[in-house]
C-alpha cells in the first residue's frame, strides 16, 4: 500500500461486518460525507490481501456514555458527565478485489479512495483503456471528481437507452439529457466508431428552452467553465444544430416558421399530401390509446394502404395528388392532369373529404375495399376522429415545395412542437420516430441515431396501445441492433410502459416526490438514496448503470448555451462568423 493514502477511520468492531455493508469509526480529525468512496484492505488466510471498496450511504454521530435524554446537556454544557463523541459512516460494498467475498476485518484502517483506487471503485478499469476506453465522464461527484458511464451500455454494444425521471421544473431532466449529448460529442474516442456521423433528434415540447443550443449563455460563469474543464470538455454551445418549427397556418405566410422566441436560423416544416401518403402518416392521426379498442386503427391501416394504391401526382402542382382506382386505365405513375370536377388534394382537409367519399358516401354504401366489413359505427367514429384532427393537425399538411425536416443537415436536429395542440405534437413525434425507424431497418447499427423525447408518458403510457407507443417499444427492444438510441424523460417512471423502462440500461433520476419515490420502478436505488431523492436540488442526479452495483449521485455543470432569449450573449454571437 502507498504511504500517501488518506486514512479516515477504522472498520467498526462493536458490531458484525458483512460482505454487503460495514461501518467506519472516523478519526477525530477526519470526516466522510455521503457518496464518498472508501477502500479497506484485509489479509485473508491462504488468499492474501483483499481490497473492499464501498460508497458511503449514511453518517451518524453519538455521545458514548450518554444514556438519558438529559445526559446530552450534562456532558456538553455542564461538564458533570463524561461522554465521548463518536462519528461513524455506513458503507455499502461496491467491489471486492480479488473477488474473494469476505467481510472486512474489524479494526482495519479505512482510506478515502482517490486516484486509481477511486477509478477501481467505479469500475473504470473495466471500461477499457487507451484507444479502446469506453469510460465517458457524465458529471462530477461531491468532491469535484469525474463520474463515468460505460458507453457500452448506451451505444448498443452491451445495452442501450437512457431513462430520466423527476419532478417537472426542478429535476432538470432535459438539461441533463442535453449535457449527456454534449459529453458524447465532446469525447468521440469514448464513443468510438459510433461517433462518426452521429445524428441526434430532439423534440422541444415545453417552452423555448431548446431553441438556443448554439448561442452562448451570458450568465455562464468561470466557475461553471472550470467544472466543464474538469470533465475534459471545452465549455461551448453545440456547434452543429438545425432548428425547425411548424409553418405558419396562413397561406400568405408560406415557408415562415411559427417561432416567436427565435426567428433567425429556424426553418419551417410541414408535409405535402404526397409525403403524407408515401410515409403512411394517417395512423398517427389516431394516437389516442383508446382508439385501438374500437377497431379504428384497423380502418386507419386499411385506408392507408388504399391511399398508397390510389394516389397519383398532379402535373404542375408539387406535392398535390388525386385519388384514382389503380385498376382503371386513367390511373398513372406519371403526373396527371385532373379531370373537370375531380378533387385535387392540396391539404389535409381535401384528403379527409376525399376519404369520406369512399368510406362514408352520402348516397351509397361504404366501399368495402376501404373499410372491410367493420360495423358502420366504427366507420363513423373513424371519420369523426379525422374531422376532429383537422383544426389541430391541418396546418402540417399542405401542397407545395417539400419542407420535410432534413436531419442530415446538422448533427443535432431540434424540432419545436411546444405551441402545437397535443394531437399535433403526437402526430409530429410519431411521424419523425417512424422515419428514423424506417431508415435504420436493415441498414446496420451505424451511423447511430439518438432520439431525445420529453414527456414520454404521453407517447408510451403504461396502459393502452397506439402506433407511436408500438414504434417506441420496438425501438426499446431492438434499438441495440438497429442503432437507434432513446433518451426518454418523464415525471413519473411508474406511468411509462414497462418494456421501455426495462430496456433502458442507464437510469437517471432527479428530485422525486415522496409517493413516486416508493414505486417499484425505483428499486435500483438504495433505501437511503430514495430518501435523499426527495431533497435533490436542480443539477443533482442519481445515476444507475449495469457496470456499478450501487447508484451514484452526481452534479452536472451549468450549460454554456442559452436556454431562453434573455440569456443569449449577443456580444459573443457574431452573425458574420465564417463569412
Task: List each model region and its residues.
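Phosphate-binding and hydrolysis-coupling loops of NTP-dependent motor/remodeling domains
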Residues: 2, 37-42, 84-109, 527-579
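Basic- and hydrophobic-enriched, low-structure N-terminal and domain-boundary segments
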Residues: 1-167, 175, 187-197, 201, ...
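Conserved ATP-driven motor cores of ASCE-family P-loop NTPases powering translocation/secretion/packaging/pilus
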Residues: 230, 469-470, 474-560
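Glycine-rich phosphate-binding loop of nucleotide-binding enzymes
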Residues: 138-242, 469, 498, 543, ...
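Short glycine-/polar-rich loops that comprise or flank the Walker A/P-loop
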Residues: 87, 159, 196-198, 238-241, ...
Amino acid at each position: 500500500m502507498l504511504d500517501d493514502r488518506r486514512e479516515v477511520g477504522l472498520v467498526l468492531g462493536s458490531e458484525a461486518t458483512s460482505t454487503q455493508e460495514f461501518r467506519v469509526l472516523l478519526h477525530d480529525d477526519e470526516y466522510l460525507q455521503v457518496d464518498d468512496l472508501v477502500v479497506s484492505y484485509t489479509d485473508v488466510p491462504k488468499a492474501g490481501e483483499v481490497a473492499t471498496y464501498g460508497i458511503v450511504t449514511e453518517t451518524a454521530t453519538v455521545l458514548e456514555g450518554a444514556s438519558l435524554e438529559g445526559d446530552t446537556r450534562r456532558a456538553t454544557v455542564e461538564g458533570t458527565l463524561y461522554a465521548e463523541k463518536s462519528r461513524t459512516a455506513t458503507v455499502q460494498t461496491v467491489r471486492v478485489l480479488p473477488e474473494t467475498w469476505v467481510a472486512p476485518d474489524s479494526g482495519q484502517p479505512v482510506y478515502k479512495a482517490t486516484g486509481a483506487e477511486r477509478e477501481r471503485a467505479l469500475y473504470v478499469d473495466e471500461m477499457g483503456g487507451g484507444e479502446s476506453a469506453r469510460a465517458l465522464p457524465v458529471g462530477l461527484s461531491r468532491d469535484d471528481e469525474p463520474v463515468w458511464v460505460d458507453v457500452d451500455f448506451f451505444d448498443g454494444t452491451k445495452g442501450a437507452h437512457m431513462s430520466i425521471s423527476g419532478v417537472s421544473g426542478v429535476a432538470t431532466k432535459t438539461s441533463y439529457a442535453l449535457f449527456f449529448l454534449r459529453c458524447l460529442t465532446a469525447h468521440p474516442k469514448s464513443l468510438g466508431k459510433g461517433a462518426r456521423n452521429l445524428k441526434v433528434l430532439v423534440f422541444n415540447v415545453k417552452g423555448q428552452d431548446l431553441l438556443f443550443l448554439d448561442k452562448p449563455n451570458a450568465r455562464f460563469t468561470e466557475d461553471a467553465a472550470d467544472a466543464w474543464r474538469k470533465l475534459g470538455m471545452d465549455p461551448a454551445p453545440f456547434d452543429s444544430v438545425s432548428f425547425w418549427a411548424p409553418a405558419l397556418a396562413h397561406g400568405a405566410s408560406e415557408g415562415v416558421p411559427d417561432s416567436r422566441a427565435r426567428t433567425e436560423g429556424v426553418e419551417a416544416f410541414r408535409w405535402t399530401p404526397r409525403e403524407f401518403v408515401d410515409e403512411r402518416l394517417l395512423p398517427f392521426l389516431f394516437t389516442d390509446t383508446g382508439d385501438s379498442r374500437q377497431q379504428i386503427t384497423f380502418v386507419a391501416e386499411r385506408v392507408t394502404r388504399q391511399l398508397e394504391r390510389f394516389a397519383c401526382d398532379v402535373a404542375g402542382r408539387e406535392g398535390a395528388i388525386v385519388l384514382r382506382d389503380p385498376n382503371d386505365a386513367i390511373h398513372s405513375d406519371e403526373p396527371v392532369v385532373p379531370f373537370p370536377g375531380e378533387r385535387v388534394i392540396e391539404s389535409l382537409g381535401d384528403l379527409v373529404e376525399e376519404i369520406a367519399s369512399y368510406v362514408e358516401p352520402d348516397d351509397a354504401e361504404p366501399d368495402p375495399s376501404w373499410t372491410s366489413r367493420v360495423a358502420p359505427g366504427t366507420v363513423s367514429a373513424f371519420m369523426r376522429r379525422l374531422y376532429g384532427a383537422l383544426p389541430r393537425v391541418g396546418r402540417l399538411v399542405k401542397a407545395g415545395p417539400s419542407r420535410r425536416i432534413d436531419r442530415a443537415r446538422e448533427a443535432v436536429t431540434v424540432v419545436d412542437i411546444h405551441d402545437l395542440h397535443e394531437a399535433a405534437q403526437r402526430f409530429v413525434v410519431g411521424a419523425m420516430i417512424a422515419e428514423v425507424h424506417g431508415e435504420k431497418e436493415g441498414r446496420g447499427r451505424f451511423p447511430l441515431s439518438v432520439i431525445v423525447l420529453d414527456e414520454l408518458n404521453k407517447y408510451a403510457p403504461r396502459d393502452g396501445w397506439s402506433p407511436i407507443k408500438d414504434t417506441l417499444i420496438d425501438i426499446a427492444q431492438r434499438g441495440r441492433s438497429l442503432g437507434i438510441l432513446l433518451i426518454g424523460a418523464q415525471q413519473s417512471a411508474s406511468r411509462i410502459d414497462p418494456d421501455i423502462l426495462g430496456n433502458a440500461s442507464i437510469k437517471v433520476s432527479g428530485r422525486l416526490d415522496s409517493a413516486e419515490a416508493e414505486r417499484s420502478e425505483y428499486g435500483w436505488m438504495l433505501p437511503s438514496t430514495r430518501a435523499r431523492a426527495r431533497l435533490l436540488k436542480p443539477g443533482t442526479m442519481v445515476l444507475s448503470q449495469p457496470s456499478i452495483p450501487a447508484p451514484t449521485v452526481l452534479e452536472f455543470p451549468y450549460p454554456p448555451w442559452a436556454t431562453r432569449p434573455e440569456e443569449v450573449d449577443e456580444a459573443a454571437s457574431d452573425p458574420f462568423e465564417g463569412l
